[in-house]
């Protein structure tokens, strides 16, 4: 259908953008220079702990939250830098590490040490757990919606693999 073709084209474009952008070294210096508050948080999903990176906008009113789903490289400096861009636009932006608990030592993306083959295997294993992804996202949405700075509105978006998960989660 036309809708499916458009969706596929959109995902391909986001993947291309994410791949090109992830090769850039702008993200880490951006976070080092930002005046916005950011931190890692742990969100519980039952007994499972999901690590997430959150950046808050510098606004005086309650803000809408953006759950930003990473690409197929995991929660990288690039994904963390994108949370700063979301906050700059006025959103409380949280990026969950959906590889939480999938790393060789039980950690998330950082546990893979930049080994792309290992990350790919982690994503292959994660792909077998769509219910886990959904419940992790439910927990992240519930967490961010209840923050005192949030107005209760939450939107979800993502890049490449994360874009696909966004469509699935909707």
Positions of the model-derived regions?
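Aromatic pocket-lining residues of Rossmann-like dinucleotide-binding sites
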Residues: 86, 169-170
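Gly/Ala-rich beta-loop-alpha elbow adjacent to hydrolase catalytic centers
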Residues: 158-162, 166
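Bacterial N-terminal signal peptides
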Residues: 10-18
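Alpha/beta-hydrolase fold nucleophile elbow
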Residues: 148-159
């Amino acid at each position: 259908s036309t809708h499916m073709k458009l969706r596929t084209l959109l995902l391909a474009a986001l993947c291309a953008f994410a791949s090109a952008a992830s090769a850039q070294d702008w993200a880490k210096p951006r976070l080092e220079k930002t005046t916005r508050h950011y931190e890692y948080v742990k969100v519980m999903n039952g007994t499972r702990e999901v690590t997430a990176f959150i950046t808050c906008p510098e606004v005086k009113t309650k803000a809408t939250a953006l759950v930003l789903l990473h690409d197929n490289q995991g929660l990288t400096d690039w994904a963390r830098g994108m949370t700063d861009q979301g906050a700059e636009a006025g959103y409380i932006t949280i990026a969950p590490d959906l590889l939480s608990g999938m790393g060789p030592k039980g950690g998330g993306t950082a546990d893979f040490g930049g080994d792309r083959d290992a990350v790919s295997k982690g994503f292959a294993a994660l792909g077998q757990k769509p219910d886990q992804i959904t419940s992790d996202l439910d927990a992240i949405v519930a967490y961010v919606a209840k923050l005192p700075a949030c107005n209760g509105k939450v939107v979800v978006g993502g890049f490449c693999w994360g874009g696909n998960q966004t469509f699935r989660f909707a």
